[in-house]
Amino acid sequence: MKDEKIAKKKLTINDIKNKKGAEPIVMITAYDALFAKIFDDYADVILVGDSLNMSFNMKESTLSADMSTMLYHTKAVCTGAKKSFILADMPFGSYTNEKQAIKNAMKFFKQTNADAVKLEVGMHQVNLVKRLCEEGINVMAHIGLKPQFFKFEGGYKIKGKSELEAKRLVEEALAFEQAGAFGILLEGTLSNVASEITRQVRVPVVGIGSGADVDGQVLVWSDMLGFFEDFKPKFVKRYLDGAALVRKGVQSYASEVKNKIFPSEEFSYKG
């Protein structure tokens, strides 16, 4: 398999916007400097997602992630990644009004090297996104299935199944583009609806569980690399059996310690 390292300088907001209809955007999550440094060679965008609450901290949802958590992990990712465009998630409850949203979004720009923030938003928040953009904050609007709303909606439900819902999603995407959002993250949406949204808006649409006819894809790294053995959504392709590889390595280490094989002379200092 060809090594698809991306030879690049630090990507800017214009680099990402210019990929619309030209080159698929590769986005992947990261939550620490170690993995961010690895992903930096391959990802156009690294998303410091509130998904870390589930995939990194093993919580049942994203809801308890807070600003201090997101700032900590965004700082770590920015330490490891020097070329990718860094997108930070605004956690649940951190943008309930314009004043709060601006204050918290500014923290990502003042305290980390993040390039943009992502918000799970609906039509009632178009003006909020507009105000953030007016303050010089790059915003990606997350529409479709919104994990922060799972309790309100009674679960994680695929979007675009009805004609009315599909129409509303197109209208939302257009409204957030008009408000100044540099891109749309579209989650859990029927592929034909995702295709129509991508066709109508002039900004990049990055999909997750929304089919192939979008401007880019994002996956949670631990899903994509096979670290969750009992959890595999339909839209996730596993490119590695990570859990098995790690388990095999730790098992070998434990066995060698128990049997006094490690450390051998090769790994010991001699006087």
UniProtKB/Swiss-Prot annotation:
SUPFAM superfamilies per UniProt: Phosphoenolpyruvate/pyruvate domain (SSF51621)
Pathway: Cofactor biosynthesis; (R)-pantothenate biosynthesis; (R)-pantoate from 3-methyl-2-oxobutanoate: step 1/2
Free-text comment on the cofactor: Binds 1 Mg(2+) ion per subunit.
InterPro entries named in the record: Pantoate_hydroxy_MeTrfase, Pyrv/PenolPyrv_kinase-like_dom, Pyrv_kinase-like_dom_sf
GO terms assigned for molecular function: 3-methyl-2-oxobutanoate hydroxymethyltransferase activity; magnesium ion binding
Gene Ontology cellular-component annotations: cytoplasm
Main location, first listed in the record: cytoplasm
Documented EC number(s): 2.1.2.11
Active-site residue list: 187 (proton acceptor)
Binding site for 3-methyl-2-oxobutanoate: 50-51, 89, 118
Swiss-Prot/TrEMBL cofactor(s): Mg(2+)
Record: residues binding Mg(2+): 50, 89, 120
Catalytic reaction equation(s): 3-methyl-2-oxobutanoate + (6R)-5,10-methylene-5,6,7,8-tetrahydrofolate + H2O = 2-dehydropantoate + (6S)-5,6,7,8-tetrahydrofolate
HAMAP family: PanB (MF_00156)
Entry's family note: Belongs to the PanB family.
PANTHER family: 3-METHYL-2-OXOBUTANOATE HYDROXYMETHYLTRANSFERASE (PTHR20881:SF0)
Quaternary state and interactors: Homodecamer; pentamer of dimers.
Protein name: 3-methyl-2-oxobutanoate hydroxymethyltransferase
Source species: Campylobacter concisus (strain 13826)
Gene field: panB
